[in-house]
């Protein structure tokens, strides 16, 4: 199944909060994630794409104090900046994602955004014909999956996957995602978020 970009968030069975941003792509498969200084970036292997296509390279994750921000595009930094200025998470997520609208590229790509402090997960999606936001508090082993395209392209109203593996990329249905390119995995341990590029 092809999902484009995806967000996965919830708690492992041992209670560890986890979140993932993943890239699946048919058009630009030569990309990777770089992690540096509390942030993660989607970057192309070929630097010439940076100037040719602004949707290929972007900040996909930022840690702001106790909060983690994950998104599929240019909304990451404005959301994080609002959190840094003291704006509550719900307002930061909704105001920025809604204001920036879907990506006005040739595909009208929806924007998907997440903020979490490890206990509460604020998740949203803005598409040409859809604006939807939800607040979730998963129990141990529960996960929420939201993708740009395909079967998981709606903000879930209840957990729609089980986080029954230590590696969330091994949890069903993620291994079935076609054209997987790269991802960043965020884990909340000891009161802090850490980022791992995959």
Curated annotation (Swiss-Prot):
What does the record give as its pathway?
Purine metabolism; IMP biosynthesis via de novo pathway; IMP from 5-formamido-1-(5-phospho-D-ribosyl)imidazole-4-carboxamide: step 1/1
Family, according to the entry, reads as follows: Belongs to the archaeal IMP cyclohydrolase family.
Function comment: Catalyzes the cyclization of 5-formylamidoimidazole-4-carboxamide ribonucleotide to IMP.
GO MF terms held by the record: IMP cyclohydrolase activity
Query: InterPro entries, from UniProt?
Result: IMP_cyclohydrolase (IPR010191), IMP_cyclohydrolase-like (IPR020600), IMP_cyclohydrolase-like_sf (IPR036795)
Q: Provide the taxonomic classification.
A: Archaea, Methanobacteriati, Methanobacteriota, Methanomada group, Methanopyri
List, in alphabetical order, the GO biological process terms annotated in this UniProt record: 'de novo' IMP biosynthetic process
The reactions it catalyses are: IMP + H2O = 5-formamido-1-(5-phospho-D-ribosyl)imidazole-4-carboxamide
Q: Which organism is it from?
A: Methanopyrus kandleri (strain AV19 / DSM 6324 / JCM 9639 / NBRC 100938)
- Under what name is this protein listed? IMP cyclohydrolase
| Keywords for this protein | Hydrolase, Purine biosynthesis
């Amino acid at each position: 199944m092809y999902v484009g970009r995806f967000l996965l968030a919830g708690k492992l069975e041992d209670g560890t909060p986890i979140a993932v941003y993943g890239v699946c792509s048919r058009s630009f498969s030569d990309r990777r994630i770089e992690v540096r200084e509390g942030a993660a970036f989607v970057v192309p292997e070929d630097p010439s794409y940076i100037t040719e296509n602004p949707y290929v390279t972007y900040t996909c994750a930022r840690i702001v104090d106790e909060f983690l921000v994950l998104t599929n595009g240019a909304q990451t930094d404005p959301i994080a900046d609002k959190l840094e200025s003291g704006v509550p998470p719900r307002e930061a997520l909704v105001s920025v994602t809604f204001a920036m609208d879907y990506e006005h590229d040739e595909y009208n790509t929806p924007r998907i955004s997440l903020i979490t402090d490890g206990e509460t997960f604020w998740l949203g999606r803005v598409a040409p014909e859809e604006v939807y936001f939800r607040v979730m508090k998963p129990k141990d082993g529960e996960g929420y999956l939201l993708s740009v395209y395909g079967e998981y392209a709606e903000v879930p109203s209840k957990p729609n996957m089980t986080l029954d593996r230590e590696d969330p990329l091994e949890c069903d249905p993620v291994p079935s995602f076609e054209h997987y390119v790269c991802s960043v995995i965020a884990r909340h341990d000891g009161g802090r978020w850490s980022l791992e590029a995959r």
